[in-house]
């Protein structure tokens, strides 16, 4: 008989007054039995997710880490794949990679970034996700899309979790749910 999946709870946090406070928060989240510490990926009053998640992983031994969610438009997928694989490697395989097409108009406006129509953002996201997964795989990636072109890049380091860290997809529209289902 198959065992049901264990139900897990995570905590989302975004800021701390100091590095010591952030590490203490991560240890407290772990001590309370939560499975994962998540962070949003926005430009406002919060810590930058990648270094903050690494600090949280370094301060704990079992706590999983992740973003809810990395906005595809804020980082080229080659950069995000490298950062995600590095987080997974240095944390001993504890990354949960949350990604999405972007939704917070105010972030785009404040950063002077174009907020493209949903179809364009979702098309770009789907390509970005394919690039990330391709870079996590063994061998060189050759990818030709409308938004991204990758020529013979072998993504290094590779994540510990194989074939890749768990991927969470943020979104509620039918097309995003279809992408998540694949």
Predicted segments with their positions:
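Active-site-adjacent structural elements that line small-molecule/cofactor binding pockets in enzymes
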Residues: 1-182
């Amino acid at each position: 008989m198959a065992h049901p999946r264990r139900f897990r709870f995570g905590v989302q946090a975004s800021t701390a007054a100091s590095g010591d406070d952030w590490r203490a928060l991560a240890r407290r989240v772990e001590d309370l039995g939560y499975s994962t510490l998540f962070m949003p990926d926005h430009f406002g009053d919060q810590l930058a997710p990648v270094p903050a998640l690494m600090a949280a992983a370094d301060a704990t031994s079992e706590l999983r880490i992740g973003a809810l969610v990395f906005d595809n438009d804020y980082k080229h997928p080659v950069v995000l794949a490298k950062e995600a694989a590095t987080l997974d490697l240095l944390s001993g395989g504890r990354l949960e990679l949350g990604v999405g097409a972007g939704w917070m108009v105010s972030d785009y406006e404040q950063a002077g970034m174009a907020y493209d129509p949903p179809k364009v953002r979702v098309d770009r996201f789907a390509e970005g996700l394919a690039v990330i997964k391709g870079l996590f795989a063994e061998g060189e990636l050759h990818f030709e899309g409308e938004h991204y072109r990758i020529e013979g890049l072998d993504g290094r380091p590779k994540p510990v979790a194989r074939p890749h860290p768990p991927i969470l997809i943020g979104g509620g529209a039918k097309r995003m749910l279809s992408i998540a289902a694949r």
